[in-house]
Design a protein with these regions (language model features):
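Cysteine-rich micro-motifs
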Residues: 18-28, 80-92
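Short cysteine-rich clusters marking metal-coordination/redox-active sites
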Residues: 3-6, 23, 63-66, 86
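Short Cys/His-rich Zn2+-coordinating modules
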Residues: 4-10, 41-51, 67-73
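Short functional micro-motifs and their immediate structural scaffolds
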Residues: 10-11, 31, 71, 94
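Short metal-binding segments enriched for Cys and/or His
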Residues: 29-43, 90-107
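Short, flexible, mixed-charge glycine/proline-rich loop motifs
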Residues: 12-17, 50-62, 76-80
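The feature marks the first
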Residues: 1-19
Length: 131
């Protein structure tokens, strides 16, 4: 698979039994369907992200998994973080620094979990100064 932003080959990193794909060029991360939910423990960390979710704005970037054009949408309603999502395979692309923003958003809710922080740290360590 190649990075949708800079076209560099993505490297696979195993983090807490999940194989994430990261770009050594632009430092983005690809999450296949449901990997993001596992990493941030979505059911516990964030309010219902499907509520108020509508189709995103089309981008020129191809999905690294299925080559469908990614769409840009808000990660959660009422927040400013925009992420790229594949409307076909439902994977999510986070640009460099966006995983930390996900952690900040998760920390603002009633019962935040620390998995997103652990995952970001492990990616940083395994990727050798990733962030």
């Amino acid at each position: 698979m190649n990075c949708p932003k800079c076209v560099s080959p993505l490297n696979e990193i195993a983090i807490e039994n999940v194989a994430l794909d990261f770009c050594p060029g632009c430092k983005g991360i690809w999450f296949d369907k449901d990997e993001m939910a596992f990493v941030i423990e979505l059911k516990n960390d964030l309010p219902n992200p499907q509520a108020e979710r509508t189709a995103g704005r089309a981008t020129v970037f191809p999905c690294p998994r299925c080559d469908t054009k990614l769409e840009e949408l808000k990660f959660v309603p009422l927040q400013d973080l925009l992420v790229d999502r594949c409307p076909s395979c439902h994977g999510i692309w986070l640009d460099n620094g966006e995983l930390q923003k996900v952690g900040t958003i998760a920390a603002g809710f009633k019962a935040p979990k620390s998995r997103v922080v652990r995952v970001a740290l492990q990616i940083k360590l395994k990727a050798g100064g990733f962030f």
